[in-house]
Amino acid sequence: MTLQIGVIGCGAIGQDHVRRMYQTLSGARVVAVTDIDAQQVREVMARHGPDIEAFDSGPALIAAPQVQAVLVTSWGPTHEELVLAAIAQGKPVFCEKPLAVTAAGCLRIVQAEMAHGQRLVQVGFMRPYDAGYRALRQVIASGQIGAPLMVHCAHRNPCVADGYTTGMAITDTLIHELDVLRWLLDDEYASAQVVYPKRTRHALPHLADPQIVLLETVGGIRIDVEVFVNCRYGYDIQCEVVGETGIARMPDPAAVPLKSAAMYSIPILTDWKQRFMAAYDVELQAFIDGVRGQRLTGPSAWDAHAAAVAADACVLAQSSGAVERMAAAPRPAFYQS
């Protein structure tokens, strides 16, 4: 069975997902698209053929009988309504982050999905599908470094757009670490604090950059995450786990070391698309396979809710300067697998 997918949102990430379904993935095809920008819809249809039907709205696309599953890649504040509509129709839905713009919105989706009685939602957190993170998790699970005690992370971008704000360092950038570290350590967060080093001269006047986020898990693991979004030199994601008997560091992406002109160098990537392109392929293939096999296993609505709760605490800590406590709710049995 070829899964028939409708895509809501034909911007950069939506078009990229359509491309990978045609060029890279198997078991699915795009049968419907919609976007508030009609030109973007026309571009998708021109590039990928006349068999794709255009719809005037997301709800109309979701209700269409030929659409068996939905991809939500539209503007973030529209996500909650669209995901709830897909659940109401009993249709599996892959939703790019954010699942909802508030933790309360994520919880409403959790409740709707549980009331439906079957997992329908996969959230677009791609890092658990990255080969480097997976290798690091295998080392932790093997016991080779003993119990994790500390984690040192960095999330560095060369630059950001003018509209990027201090809060977005949490809600747009750190949110990926907040998700993947729960998965990596199999632990929940207990507290968060944000401290500000000397400010880079490359940051816009309204932006505090860099920032250091200090997290503690329920199990007592201490985590520090450097968020530096104007580092200039490249896109650089680092993660090192310090255990009782050893240290494990996530490998950098494979690149050809170069010796030339009396220098030894290794190239560094410049954007997130390059760094996680393979992970995007794997996560979307996992969604397709999960729908066809009637068992979704990727990042869930509950994972999105947990990340949103942690993000709220971090945003509060940005302004308070204090250690902000989090009450980690237990994962519902519905999401334990």
From Swiss-Prot:
- The reply to whether Translocase figures as a keyword in the UniProt entry is no
Record keywords: NAD included? yes
Cite the entry's keywords alphabetically: NAD, Oxidoreductase
Task: Kindly state which reaction or reactions the protein catalyses.
Answer: myo-inositol + NAD(+) = scyllo-inosose + NADH + H(+)
- Signal sequence span is none
EC number(s) per entry: 1.1.1.18
What InterPro entries does the record tag this protein with? Gfo-Idh-MocA_inositol_DH, Gfo/Idh/MocA-like_OxRdtase_C, Gfo/Idh/MocA-like_OxRdtase_N, MI/DCI_dehydrogenase, NAD(P)-bd_dom_sf
GO terms, biological process: inositol catabolic process
Q: Which Pfam families match?
A: GFO_IDH_MocA, GFO_IDH_MocA_C
Q: Name one GO molecular function term.
A: nucleotide binding
Q: What does this protein do?
A: Involved in the oxidation of myo-inositol (MI) to 2-keto-myo-inositol (2KMI or 2-inosose).
What family does the entry list?
Answer: Belongs to the Gfo/Idh/MocA family.
Q: Which HAMAP family match?
A: IolG
Spell out the subunit comment. Answer: Homotetramer.
- Write the protein's name: Inositol 2-dehydrogenase
